[in-house]
Amino acid sequence: MPFRDLILFNLSKFLLTEDEESLEIVSSLCRGFEISYDDLITYFPDRKYHKYISKVFEHVDLSEELSMEFHDTTLRDLVYLRLYKYSKCIRPCYKLGDNLKGIVVIKDRNIYIREANDDLIEYLLKEYTPQIYTYSNERVPITGSKLILCGFSQVTFMAYTTSHITTNKKVDVLVSKKCIDELVDPINYQILQNLFDKGSGTINKILRKIFYSVTGGQTP
């Protein structure tokens, strides 16, 4: 594994989270491989990072022993950093009244309803006639489905990124520990790939490069 990737990964982590352990690792690697301040800012040209990068060379405590390999948790750390301070919300649809409550999952012509009040059921029967759609007691997979949320203020990142959500009130997209655990599951590799490919900005581009280096893929 190129030592520069280790430096860039830990420096990105420090710049995002101010993690002191990452700062110590970067400082130690830079001293050991004679990496200068000018070398680092070529990867981080944005001036807002420069005062933090200077701390790398002001740091006194250095690690006596350093691993030249990424840890087993690196992929999870990459996802955490990519979604660090993630902020997204879903705007309400004017067609859905404030009086509607419940969850509806629509996949093809199958409809699964949960915790719905009478107003929501009445709305569904008008919009999705039983002559065409099948109302089922069995859960319908969320992935690739249309999700109608009424009366909720939050939705998980996994639900947001794998389905088309319509809501009757503003909904915040939540990134949780469980969500990150699900994302690093090999079955969700395509979701991860899309997540890193869509990233813009200096640090996101570096995280994308390291993501493909760690997973063995080819950077687009």
From Swiss-Prot:
Pfam families: Chordopox_G2 (PF05796). Induction: Expressed in the early phase of the viral replicative cycle. The keyword Protein biosynthesis applies. Keywords: Early protein, Elongation factor, Protein biosynthesis. Involved in postreplicative transcription elongation on intermediate and late genes. Belongs to the orthopoxvirus OPG087 family. Interacts with H5 and A18. Might be part of a transcription complex composed at least of OPG087/G2, OPG145/A18, and OPG110/H5. This is Late transcription elongation factor OPG087. It comes from Vaccinia virus (strain Western Reserve) (VACV).
